[in-house]
Amino acid sequence: MKTQALKGMRDLLPAEQTLRDYIQGKILETYRSAGFERISTPMLEDMENLDKSEGGDNLNLIFKVLKRGDKLTAALNTGDPKQLSDMGLRYDLTLPLSRYYAANKDKLPNPFKVIQTDRVFRAERPQKGRLREFVQCDIDILGDASPNAEVELIDVTTRALLNIGFTGFTVNINDRRILRGMLESMGFAADTLDSVCITFDTMDKIGAEGVKAELTEKQLPESAIQALADFIAAGDVTLDAVAARCADPAIANDLKYVLATANTLAAGRYQVAYCPSLVRGQGYYTGMVFEVTCPQFSGAVAGGGRYDNMVGKFLGVQVPAVGFSIGFERVCGILLEQGYQIPGAKQKIALLYGKDTDFPAVLSKAAALREQYNVTVLPQGKKLGKQLGQLEAAGFAGAAFMDKDEVKIFAQQ
């Protein structure tokens, strides 16, 4: 029998789980203080729903569940691999929420402000920062088409990050419609815009020349590629410059409103910036998109955007929707590396008792000590020094004894 967890999945030791519980609790507390309500959905979704969810590259990372019994036999006989699975593990929480809302719309308030903190699964190639099973902490607003929904999500999410001790971050914001409008005005065909956007999204990593080379490899119009290269080279990738190439000024006005309002709410505690190359990988985003980044860490710690077409796939009627997700695993990992300590947490001690000690008396003393400490009751070992060393190594702050009033705190030795 193998003792190791599967690749890309993790066992958690008590100290890390305690920190995760605290962080998730603070995030939930912040979300709930803003009137958001928590729901839960199944981990498994219908494969047809998953396949039609426009999840970008995530659609290639779905853990699929084989059909069973006669249905599997019949599927094997077709010779079509797509017939083998009828359900799969969710790769994020947006598709399940959209299905949930469509099924329960008449029972829910409008707009619906919702929390989801749950596990999702992706068949990633395991590496640092890439797990196959991980937790997402999402808030979404369904039923509000105004840019105030984006402002509220940014405000609540950033307050959650601040409340768990996260500082020095930047909220980057863009609108896919403005970027697409600019690219179309340069001569890129509408059916190539998604591909162009994905390449443009990597500009901060590969530079302007890298973007030009990658678009050339895709055999896109040379004149359009050169127009984009000239625009980037001019150093004029400002919101006003990009918006000037977009046919609908209302889109740019909404983005300016969100940027200005979010910056006011930040009050200097974090930065808010327009990021012209920000796209986000999921194909279901339809408007504004946002990411939270920290200069000292690579990659985003939170991200989201507007997905006005997703619920309509179930209802046949468009429902405005926008969400923001905190990368829980990433945030926990960063705080662990920084040696984060839970504010105001009680110290953990062990109350040691002898073999002949009256056990109800042990529990009574433990109850009294719990006014000040988190107390575990343990039988005292034959080699007390060794036992105390093991307790300290396991994260205990000290030990108490039945025949002594004081608590022995290890750091004070």
Roles of regions detected by a PLM:
Residues 50-51, 180, 202, 387:
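Short Asp/Glu-rich motifs
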Residues 19-36, 45-46, 81-84, 92-106, ...:
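Positively charged, Gly/Ser-enriched RNA/tRNA-binding surfaces
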Residues 1-4, 183, 188, 195:
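Charged, compositionally biased N-terminal leader segments and the immediate start
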Residues 54, 180-190, 283-290, 337:
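Short glycine/threonine-rich loop-to-helix capping motif typified by GTGT followed
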Residues 58-74, 187-211:
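Acidic, His- and aromatic-enriched active-site or binding-groove loops in soluble protein domains
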Residues 1-91, 95, 103, 151, ...:
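TRNA-binding/sensing appendages of the translation machinery
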Residues 51-66, 190-194, 292-295, 396-402:
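Short, structured secondary-structure boundary patches
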Residues 170-181:
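Glycine-rich, mobile lid/loop segments that gate access to catalytic sites or pores
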